[in-house]
Regions:
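Active-site-adjacent structural elements that line small-molecule/cofactor binding pockets in enzymes
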Residues: 1-311
Length: 311
């Protein structure tokens, strides 16, 4: 298994994020990802939020070993041809370390505030499907033509090409079983979702069915989980963490308790065994649910005391 940190861009400073990423690289983590939002998901819309792509580009240059990526870019925020160009350049800057996470887009207040159309869920997913086709064509073809319902390319170049071949690792985030997982089966190198072994096993079986329908080997898709870390022997702390997850993620957390990687070191090891049995090969720890000083201590314990047995 590989282990990564999923860094919220809210309530952060550039110097703090850089220090944290240098620390996780030095202590043996494998991947660092940033969230893609412009403001807090609150009615007041108050609070500083770092811009994801410029931050990630700087991190890629200054943190030279770990893979770098997004969990996940909102497809509604940028034309996919522009994202393809941005991603190719960041893959060059990083020396081929980019993990490009992409999702349909969900945070409505950002769209309202900035005048970005917030399409129906159906249309956002249809756009996500087309966006994957647009980006992969631009990355792999000398010139691209595409005539979709939402996006169009006409003899479009993309040069220089990314370092990774045939293209940067494309990760799709989301767990919708009827449509999202079908898009994953068609286009993704990597699938990411909130949840633990129960969620990943259930939705993974659905993904396998979609892969069979499109004639794809499901083993060619990396599967990753986002789980909140808490090393403790106090059950009430675990329950409070699950409540926090339910409040913060709402419908995006299919099972808040299953989304907790929490308990004693032995209990966490048991959870990791179950994750691996569910087909998960990458685990991301989000920074958003706990004070960073507390989480950082647990990150250090996890990577030195628990993770080595699963590599």
């Amino acid at each position: 298994m590989r282990f990564g940190l999923f860094t919220s861009m809210g309530a952060q400073t550039w110097s703090g994020v850089l220090d944290l990423w240098r620390h996780i690289e030095a202590t043996g983590w494998d991947i660092g990802c940033v969230a893609d939002h412009f403001m807090p998901n609150t009615k007041e819309r108050e609070g500083a939020v770092l811009e994801s792509w410029s931050t990630l580009s700087a991190l890629a240059a200054l943190v030279p070993r770990i893979r770098v990526g997004t969990i996940v870019l909102g497809n509604t925020y940028r034309h996919p041809a522009v994202v393809a160009k941005m991603a190719a350049q960041l893959d060059i800057i990083s020396g081929g370390r980019l993990l490009l996470g992409l999702g349909a887009g969900w945070q409505e207040n950002e769209h309202e505030a900035y005048g970005i159309p917030f399409y129906t869920m159906r249309e956002r997913l249809e756009r996500l499907d087309e966006a994957c086709q647009v980006m992969k064509s631009l990355w792999t073809q000398r010139r691209s033509d595409f005539e979709g319902r939402y996006y169009r390319l006409a003899d479009a170049p993309l040069d220089p090409k990314p370092v990774q071949t045939p293209h940067p690792e494309l990760m799709i985030g989301g767990g919708g079983e009827r449509v999202t997982l079908r898009i994953v089966a068609k286009h993704a190198d990597h699938w990411n979702v909130w949840g633990g072994a129960r969620v990943l096993a259930q939705k993974g079986a659905v993904l396998d069915e979609h892969c069979a329908a499109v004639g794809r080997d499901p083993k060619t898709i990396t599967r990753s989980a986002n789980m909140a870390l808490l090393i403790t022997d106090k059950k009430d702390q675990v329950e409070r963490l699950a409540e926090t997850i339910a409040t913060r993620l709402g419908r995006h957390a299919a099972d808040p308790r299953d989304t907790c990687l929490a308990g004693t070191p032995d209990q966490i090891r048991d959870q990791l065994h179950q994750l691996r049995e569910a087909g998960v090969s990458v685990l991301f720890i989000p920074s958003v649910f706990r004070p960073l000083d507390e989480l950082r201590r647990d990150l250090d314990r996890f990577i030195t005391e628990i993770a080595p047995a699963f590599r």
